[in-house]
Amino acid sequence: MDEQMALFCYQEMPAWQADEIPDALRAGHAFDEGEWACLNVLQGRLKLTEADNASVELTAEDGDHMIAPQQQFTVEPLTDDTEIKLSLYCAAKDYFNKKYGMSATHSAVVAAENIVPVGKALDMGCGQGRNALFLGLKGFDVTAVDNNPQAVQNVNELAHIEGLDMRALEYDLNAANLQDHFDYIVATVVFMFLHPRFVPQVIADMQAHTNPGGYNLIVSAMDTEDFPCPMPFPFKFKEGELREYYRGWEIAEYKEELGAMHAKDAAGNPIQFKFVTMLTKKPEA
């Protein structure tokens, strides 16, 4: 039940009368990985058979019946007046992808959820809002900034639709001029697009505007001897460089590992180079 309580409804199907129930549900169906189905009988009686061939008879009094991802099931109306409804649920990390077709929340942001407590967060270079909206859905008080006014407008519109406690602002990411303090600052795939001479100031500004005990999460491209970065990013971290900027902070996670872009080389293979991922905690006051 705890897992189900952490799920979010991203699609509600129309109610189906007995003779309208799709053939796919009668013959046998399974929803994709990461998709839970909530089955409700609105009236009448329904026979539900799941993967283990165990059958149960459901009525309106039974309330919600959750069907796990990739679990085969069939339904059979037992009365002519049967009416049912299906709603689809997913975890927070997949919600905006499934509901709005956005890019998935960055995996590093999802992983940090197990370490970083809910608080006041800043998403630097929010783009379409894949990380900021996820954090808002998880209960963070979120400020999202980007230098693209259209992106800022889109994030604000989605936040309003979803009733999230967040706001998006237009901001020059090279400015190193944050105006508030935060418990958590996220910058995924952002530093590689900054002007190199502003990077030290931007990092120092992030650090200065992180509350004691707060966290910074950075993911960015690298250029190393073993894997030179062929992409024309304005800035790329060198081996160990990002860690040095955070000397004196507690390193919760640090890794330099191969990643791939959507871009491909002349042979049609994904272009690979290293990315640095670092989650670090500011010392307590």
Regions picked out by a protein language model, each given a short descriptive name:
Residues 184-198:
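A short SAM/SAH-binding and catalytic strip from SAM-dependent methyltransferases
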Residues 177-185:
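A short acidic, Gly/Pro-enriched loop at the edge of an enzyme's catalytic core
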Residues 69-91:
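Ligand-binding loop in jelly-roll beta-barrel domains
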Residues 200-212:
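A short glycine-rich, Lys/Arg-flanked "PGG" loop and its adjoining helix->strand segment in the class I
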Residues 14-33:
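Conserved short histidine dyad/triad with adjacent acidic residue
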Residues 53-70:
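Short acidic-glycine-tyrosine-enriched beta hairpin
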Residues 3, 26, 91-116, 122, ...:
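Class I (Rossmann-like) S-adenosyl-L-methionine-dependent methyltransferase catalytic domain
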Residues 34-47:
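Short, conserved beta-strand element in jelly-roll/cupin
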